[in-house]
From Swiss-Prot:
This is Teretoxin Tan14.1. The cysteine framework is XIV (C-C-C-C). Belongs to the teretoxin N (TN) superfamily. Its main location: secreted. Keywords: Cleavage on pair of basic residues, Disulfide bond, Secreted, Signal, Toxin. It is found in: Secreted. The keyword Secreted applies.
Length: 113
């Protein structure tokens, strides 16, 4: 959750920076016969935005790879399952239903038992 908030904040800052640079570059008067200042800023901003977006996406993909998937041994509490305690099954179902898989109670109960 904290990673998503950081990524959202970074994306907002990047968009705000790009908008500010675009507004500032278009507000200056440009001499005839020279490269317009706005085109230079656009190419630099575009490059920076692309690099930043690639970095953010790679971090997000890396974080998703390290999260447990449905059916991963970390979902069920093995010590509770071996002793037959109901708490282990309840925890497994709870973890399954609150995961990103979006499974319902019956699917999670089938998987955990």
């Amino acid at each position: 959750m904290a990673l998503e908030a950081q990524m959202t904040l970074r994306m907002f800052v990047l968009v705000a920076m790009a908008s500010t640079v675009h507004v500032l570059s278009s507000s200056f008067s440009e001499d005839l016969g020279t490269v317009p200042l706005s085109k230079v800023f656009r190419s630099e901003t575009r490059f920076t935005l692309i690099q930043s977006l690639r970095a953010l996406l790679s971090r997000q993909l890396e974080a998703e790879v390290h999260q447990p998937e449905i059916g991963h041994p970390g979902f069920s509490d093995e010590t509770s399952s071996r002793t037959g305690k109901r708490g282990g099954l309840g925890r497994c179902i709870h973890n399954c239903m609150n995961s990103r898989g979006g499974l319902n109670f019956i699917q999670c109960k089938t998987m955990c038992s």
